[in-house]
UniProtKB/Swiss-Prot annotation:
Enzyme category, top tier: hydrolase
Subunit annotation: Homopentamer. Interacts with the packaging RNA (pRNA). Part of a DNA-gp3-gp16 complex.
Positions bound to ATP: G13, A14, R15, G16, I17, G18, K19, S20
Protein name: DNA packaging protein
Family from the record: Belongs to the phi29likevirus gp16 family.
Domains (record comment): The N-terminus contains the ATPase activity and the C-terminus (CTD) binds DNA. The CTD is likely a vestigial nuclease that has lost its hydrolytic capability since Phi-29 is not a concatamer that neads cleavage.
Organism: Bacillus phage B103 (Bacteriophage B103)
Gene Ontology molecular-function annotations: ATP binding; ATP hydrolysis activity
UniProt-listed SUPFAM superfamilies: P-loop containing nucleoside triphosphate hydrolases (SSF52540)
Residue segments, region DNA-binding: 222-321
Xref: InterPro entries: P-loop_NTPase (IPR027417), Podovirus_Gp16 (IPR008784)
Keywords: ATP-binding, Hydrolase, Late protein, Nucleotide-binding, Viral genome packaging, Viral release from host cell
E.C. number(s) listed in UniProt: 3.6.4.-
């Protein structure tokens, strides 16, 4: 993953596969060899209560070095090595300087059950922290770690990322998504008593099989060859296309759209640009009313998980029910 040299990296893998351990080991080696420092990030301050145990599982790999945690500072051989920072307090870091930090590790960047635990404007918060730490330096990288909960999260939605979950590496211009293969690890874990206990359960799908248990394939379908483009919608900066297949009586909400169309609807004032039409009440706009009707009648399809998540959020905002 590191060989791709992307500034922002996401690693989503089965629980216990060793994501956190590997990303703990890397900055330790960089500090010992090059004097580079690191920052360990969790979402909220209470999640750092046990940070004093950070080195407990890895210290034995470096028997000639002394590891200590002082408050929220990491030390190796008596020298400051890194910091533990809650993302929720990112604004307090804006005036701090970290000229020797080359690695930011954000652990558990995806919430395991719902979106209620994300901090307001969380992606902007992380980007602000990266900006504060790296400044204009080109040698920094942020690595975000998570269990396989959902391929859809505020970060992928923000950047419009739709990774192929069957590929280990999905490389973009400045971003890399790694979804490690955990088959060998899963086979061994299934032999344990706990592995046998969770095998076949939803928890087992996430922990053993690296399946995205919070994602649903309901209403996800690639648009048909007979579908025709009708109009575009802009929501939270993302432009989406709406297509119709009159033979199947289906509408499709997709990432594909016709950039030359004059039928472009903005659902918020923030998205409104010249040449667009602002829709404040879906019942008063023919196209949007038809889209909402298709959704309510089960006749709307989404071409991927990203479109499904954004679509459901969009309809909720319009109070479609």
């Amino acid at each position: 993953m590191l060989s791709y040299d992307r500034i922002l990296n996401f690693v989503i893998g089965a629980r216990g596969i060793g994501k956190s351990y590997a990303m703990k080991k890397h900055p330790i080696k960089r500090f010992i060899k090059h004097g580079e420092q690191f920052i360990y990030v969790r979402r909220y301050k209470p999640e750092l209560k046990k940070i004093g145990n950070y080195f407990n599982d890895i210290a034995q790999e470096f028997p000639n070095h002394e590891f200590k945690v002082k408050g929220r500072q990491f030390c190796i051989d008596g020298k400051l090595t890194g910091w533990a920072i809650p993302l929720s307090a990112w604004q307090s870091e804006k005036s701090n300087a970290y000229p020797m930090v080359t690695t930011i590790i954000f652990d558990e960047f995806i919430r395991e059950r719902d979106n209620s635990g994300y901090i307001p404007n969380e992606v902007d918060a992380l980007l602000n922290l990266m900006d504060t730490v790296f400044r204009t330096r080109e040698n920094g990288r942020c690595i975000c770690l998570s269990n396989a909960v959902s391929i859809i999260n505020p970060y992928f939605v923000y950047f419009g990322l739709v990774p192929d979950i069957n590929k280990r590496f999905n490389a973009y211009k400045h971003i890399l998504i790694e979804i490690p293969d955990s088959k060998d690890f899963s086979d061994e874990r299934r032999k344990t008593k706990f592995g046998q206990l969770i095998d076949g359960t939803e928890y087992g799908e996430m922990s053993l099989d690296n399946e995205f248990v919070n994602d649903s394939d309901v209403f996800i379908e690639k648009r048909s060859k007979n579908s025709k483009f009708v109009f575009s919608i802009v929501y939270k900066g993302m432009r989406m296309g709406v297509w119709v297949d009159t033979q199947q009586m289906l509408l499709y909400l997709t990432t594909d759209h016709d950039p030359s169309t004059k039928n472009v609807y903005a659902l918020t004032a923030d998205d409104l640009e010249e040449g667009m039409i602002l829709v404040s009440n879906y019942k008063k706009n023919y196209h949007i009313r038809k889209l909402c009707s298709a959704f309510m009648n089960g006749q709307l399809r989404f071409d991927n998980q990203l479109m499904r998540t954004i679509g459901y959020e969009m309809f909720k905002k319009m109070r479609v029910q």
